Amino acid sequence: MEVDTEEKRHRTRSKGVRVPVEPAIQELFSCPTPGCDGSGHVSGKYARHRSVYGCPLAKKRKTQDKQPQEPAPKRKPFAVKADSSSVDECDDSDGTEDMDEKEEDEGEEYSEDNDEPGDEDEEDEEGDREEEEEIEEEDEDDDEDGEDVEDEEEEEEEEEEEEEEEENEDHQMNCHNTRIMQDTEKDDNNNDEYDNYDELVAKSLLNLGKIAEDAAYRARTESEMNSNTSNSLEDDSDKNENLGRKSELSLDLDSDVVRETVDSLKLLAQGHGVVLSENMNDRNYADSMSQQDSRNMNYVMLGKPMNNGLMEKMVEESDEEVCLSSLECLRNQCFDLARKLSETNPQERNPQQNMNIRQHVRPEEDFPGRTPDRNYSDMLNLMRLEEQLSPRSRVFASCAKEDGCHERDDDTTSVNSDRSEEVFDMTKGNLTLLEKAIALETERAKAMREKMAMEAGRRDNMRSYEDQSPRQLPGEDRKPKSSDSHVKKPYYGKDPSRTEKKESKCPTPGCDGTGHVTGLYPHHRSLSGCPHKDRVPPEILAMHESVLKCPTPGCTGRGHVNSNRNSHRSLSGCPIAAAEKLAKAQEKHQSCDVSKSSQASDRVLRPMCFVKQLEIPQYGYRNNVPTTTPRSNLAKELEKYSKTSFEYNSYDNHTYGKRAIAPKVQTRDISPKGYDDAKRYCKDPSPSSSSTSSYAPSSSSNLSCGGGSSASSTCSKSSFDYTHDMEAAHMAATAILNLSTRCREMPQNLSTKPQDLCATRNPDMEVDENGTLDLSMNKQRPRDSCCPILTPLEPMSPQQQAVMNNRCFQLGEGDCWDLPVDYTKMKPRRIDEDESKDITPEDLDPFQEALEERRYPGEVTIPSPKPKYPQCKESKKDLITLSGCPLADKSIRSMLATSSQELKCPTPGCDGSGHITGNYASHRSLSGCPRAKKSGIRIAQSKEDKEDQEPIRCPVPGCDGQGHITGKYASHRSASGCPLAAKRQKDGYLNGSQFSWKSVKTEGMSCPTPGCDGSGHVSGSFLTHRSLSGCPRATSAMKKAKLSGEQMLTIKQRASNGIENDEEIKQLDEEIKELNESNSQMEADMIKLRTQITTMESNLKTIEEENKVIEQQNESLLHELANLSQSLIHSLANIQLPHMDPINEQNFDAYVTTLTEMYTNQDRYQSPENKALLENIKQAVRGIQV
């Protein structure tokens, strides 16, 4: 019972939820601890704090009450020091041994529950955590009144008492090793305080530092998750009770606050000139953490878990000298801090130390690899060395015992001597804790690295576990990640119930659902919207893609309304299926009179999911009741059957649009690869020859909406394999079974749709290499196929069943009835022919619609064995077809109800075709109706009424743009979606004429509707649209048009040969290819021309730049010439040449020419006068600088 309580508490902590024990006692916004006014809380100085998590007083009381449940061997490492006072103090904890054993047993039980047997460390840690919470919750009710100063003083008092008493107890345990059990019992409480000395001092420091509220919240969350996951990840820990108990407010070592604290401690250590020791279990852990790191790690590594106190003492004494110099430095620092504390407010001094204590002591102690022996040995050695260095420590401890530590007191400005001593002593303890914290962090990092290999393996195991289990503990998911980075990652509590559902995730390996087209759902079960489809192995991709293709045999997705996607999963928009519908409807009209045909189905050519395959034509009787199916959730429903595969090695040439397609029925299991065993259809009329094969319920390919199902087939003379394409059979089975659920609910409505199958097959059926079937109806076909009768189990009178069976059996070898099959509840009905003779026409009425007679050109029809009822009977259920959408059963009631007429589109004259949201005759909204008009003007106005309107906008003469499918824009410039164009095309089709504005392009039309030029199609204004889906004239053509034999033959051949075999399409493809090639050539030429133009432009720019340079040079030369001219004129102004005027600008050229001639021909100027003249000229020109 106690273990259950502890586990409940454990789960509560993992969620980060804290529930007060007695909420009625709490005040609305105050700390629930009696005597606590909110001061000193970890999360802030808020008196309105409502939790005991950060309450220092509750922590103190909790630690006092926890000690009786701690096992004695955990305290042996402290038995190193001897103190006479400890002997007297060890007499007040009798009777705690039983509680220790009980605690240990509980810890073992919890460890076994978590699949970690044999770890006392984790057991004790978990037990202490839970005991800690229990005491904490109890203390919440006891600690509400009181004053801050008193609480702080009491706590500081007890902290110092713990220090002194624990030292005494250690000495006593060392000196009296034979009395260890007795000492433990006597000094249990004091020893607990000593064990938690670092915790209490850390809390006091936290009260001074007032760590930010967010840091405290993160600390609580991290510690809770650590405690939650400690049991599953502690493999090397040994007796770690105290460590688990102290993990409640630990912070993440990877946080910024912790890093800052570590940096500050390193600086503090380096300031004392201390060098790290390299003796760390033969590891050079050069973390440069400080002298505390080195010293403490020596003790941690040497002080292995030894339960012998004497061994601990020997290890301690052998290493004391290593720490002397460092402790001396710390002692000096201690005195300095004490003096500062006596003069300043402690809150201004200790925030960094507070951070360190909270962020280092807690995380290190929470580390699973540590043992309490090491912790105790570290602290014991350090404190003993401190006492050797400073005899005043005991004095300060006693002072703290008597007066209490007021370090957290807000009134620390007091400078009395007692307070100074207390502050100094607490500072000493704080520095000790800083040393211990750094040592713990060092060992934690080392042990983390040691456990990386183990964690890697565990991480792999957890991954495989995640694939099998939808839930797991949050800690199990986080721990392997933390080992990768050598430190703990911050983790916030998460409810395990919100974990992802692993059993229905995206089939792409490694995909978590992110980036899916349909949303960020990790449980997406389809490859269609997965952005990582390239990762999918080919076999998986093939399995999924095969289901996504168009179920029409021979269709590659080309010409579909919703683009050229091969993965189209619906018959809606398939041109082949639509053409087949048209052909079938034409034959129906030939067999029905015109007055009745006008009331036939208004959605025969509105292709929906599987409506082309399963609609049963009207040859001799009224067609069976059609059912409309919304396609909103088609893709999702079809995925249920995505793992069922089929083959179509053969396909009946009258299957499409003539009869329900029957998948093979396996006699044993249905494998995901498909139906391997052929369903055999025979024609022996003897019911005794029928054989039964069953569908085994399968999660991957259960074709029944209601669970397991069985199918019966009647076998006889000519057995054959009836296998066909995976997609076609899948869609057929889905469509046939979509009413299975409703069979139990409304048998009367379903009685008009007998779930029977008469399978006929032409052995000479032609299937080309692309799977395209020859569906032409002009071929002669022997009517020697079998007629298996499969009747529903659900309430049906034996007479009706007999009628259904005998109707088919009486056809004999020459004829057979084609009926839809029900795979949900099928059992062979064996009756005698005598019983069928007593059946009245009333019994046949619900089923007579389903019994049809096929009439094809050239075929010999055999009259029905039962009298025919009035053909083309007027009914609202005339041509509601069986839909392949799995959700058809959801709308069956409304579709079969007599009020189904109310579900049609309210637009007058609209039959549902051309609707944006689908070609549903039952569309009840004007939103997507192409014929809906907001202005009240009737769309069906005559051509003359609209001739006077603006013809420039919509190209259809007389159209004002209203009612366009693509928008109510009056300026619409396309005939696409124009209701007027659709109406005129329909009228023209009925009159055998075409419209002038589109008649030029009608020769190359690809829309299967005869006479349709592609205009007005829902999916766009493409004249070459190759689909009947959205064709505004398709429905009217089905209703009223009487196609000629040649036209019907053309349509049938086009549908049977497939789009790929259409010569027009091939020719268009060739033309497109040629155009693409020519376009590529033109683009290459353009690129060359652009390159040449660019080169020429660059050359032109270069020439222009050169010209500019030349012009600048010319300008400079002209300027220099002008200067020289002026200088020459000034120099020769006084020299008069013979026969010339004095030099000036006007005769300058002539003057220069004369001078040049004189100097060139000096021989002619040898007279003294000329020589003197030349000499004067030389002297005058000599001063000119050229």
Curated annotation (Swiss-Prot):
The keyword Calcium does not apply. Residues 685-709 have a biased composition (Low complexity). One of its GO terms (biological process) is neuron development. It is linked to Intellectual developmental disorder, autosomal dominant 39: A disorder characterized by significantly below average general intellectual functioning associated with impairments in adaptive behavior and manifested during the developmental period. MRD39 patients show delayed psychomotor development and autistic features. Residues 361-372, 449-487, 495-505, 666-683 have a biased composition (Basic and acidic residues). A zinc finger (CCHHC-type) spans 22-65, 497-540, 541-584, 896-939, 945-988, 998-1041. Transcription factor that plays a key role in neuronal differentiation by specifically repressing expression of non-neuronal genes during neuron differentiation. In contrast to other transcription repressors that inhibit specific lineages, mediates repression of multiple differentiation programs. Also represses expression of negative regulators of neurogenesis, such as members of the Notch signaling pathway, including HES1. Zn(2+) 6 binds at residues 1007, 1012, 1025, 1031. Interacts with SIN3B. InterPro entries: Myelin_TF, Znf_C2H2C, Znf_C2H2C_sf. Pfam families: MYT1, zf-C2HC. Zn(2+) 3 binds at residues 550, 555, 568, 574. Zn(2+) 1 binds at residues 31, 36, 49, 55. Zn(2+) 5 binds at residues 954, 959, 972, 978. Signal peptide: none annotated. This is Myelin transcription factor 1-like protein. Residues 1056-1130 form a coiled coil. One of its GO terms (molecular function) is zinc ion binding. It comes from the Eukaryota. One of its GO terms (cellular component) is nucleus.
